Amino acid sequence: MTNIRKSHPLMKIINNAFIDLPAPSNISSWWNFGSLLGICLILQILTGLFLAMHYTSDTTTAFSSVTHICRDVNYGWLIRYLHANGASMFFICLFIHVGRGLYYGSYMFLETWNIGVILLFTVMATAFMGYVLPWGQMSFWGATVITNLLSAIPYIGTDLVEWIWGGFSVDKATLTRFFAFHFILPFVITALAAVHLLFLHETGSNNPTGIPSDMDKIPFHPYYTIKDILGALFMMLILLILVLFSPDLLGDPDNYTPANPLNTPPHIKPEWYFLFAYAILRSIPNKLGGVLAVVTSILILILMPMLHTSKQRSMMFRPVSQCLFWMVVADLITLTWIGGQPVEHPLIIIGQLASILYFLIILVLMPITSIIENNLLKW
């Protein structure tokens, strides 16, 4: 009799994806973050669903409804902070996942990589809209500033912004539609993640060496199921420490003040995971230029396969490229720091230099370094 796991139409899909999947024998812990992102997504959908049961998307009651969730709903505070800090964990995993792809040349799987970039954009859009929902000061002004950037688009900009707002300013209509989009997008993300996985399983996983591993595969279960569970436990531990000991560590105190269109906060800034982009935006004095720079800073990921000039896929055996990679990481951390600082003399120039360095390393130095390393192999 055939095993039901291998014959049942539904079980067969699960089996081929998570049980009998042939996986490289040498993939390191950097390969854990795909499954961690899946866990984050499930956590966000579940906590978000329970929050939506008590939340009201009306400008007069939104702030109060979030307070009500924290004070009156059973474990509402836990659900709310799991959701808020779960988003931070989501982005930490996302950045590491993308960084792993860049380091080990996983971007050579074109379909998987491009869907991954679309996923990144979708998650960023979802997180932005979620940040608007509590209707605090930073929610309101963050929404105003970021949506206003679209007005930099020539000819249609102003109309586009007013169309997104549903009026002449961020108001009730904006909040309602942001809630609707914030609710539906995670399901779009789930569908995209399934397609991401589908394309990945067409080629099989990459590995740290970047060398094809077809001759040395092991079954996903039990080896990588156990490994993923260990990673998940670590992540949940960090998340729970964050939620139970310092739930507001990554938030902004301004968001505990109800939204007031007549009072602008002294420093408008997004959540920490958008600060690097915000720093790039602010480093260019021109509005359209700043918007283009921000979009390019993320869209640059799509160009990675075209910028790959090395004969080796992975950076494992390319020490100079490794140095440049870690320079990009340090540069992004610098940009994140600058994005959270006020616009003052020494900080402005640091932000501008960090922004220039980011594009310089990725677009110029990395491809040239790869060519030099290719020639060094001939010695």
UniProtKB/Swiss-Prot annotation:
Which Cys residues form disulphide pairs? none
Q: What is its main location?
A: mitochondrion
Q: Where does heme b b566 bind?
A: H97, H196
CDD domains listed in its UniProt record: cytochrome_b_C, Cytochrome_b_N
Membrane recorded as keyword: yes
- Give the classification, highest ranks: Eukaryota, Metazoa, Chordata, Craniata, Vertebrata
Q: Name one GO cellular component term.
A: respiratory chain complex III
Provide the gene name from the record: MT-CYB
The protein's name in its UniProt record: Cytochrome b
What Gene3D superfamilies does the entry give? Cytochrome Bc1 Complex, Chain C (1.20.810.10)
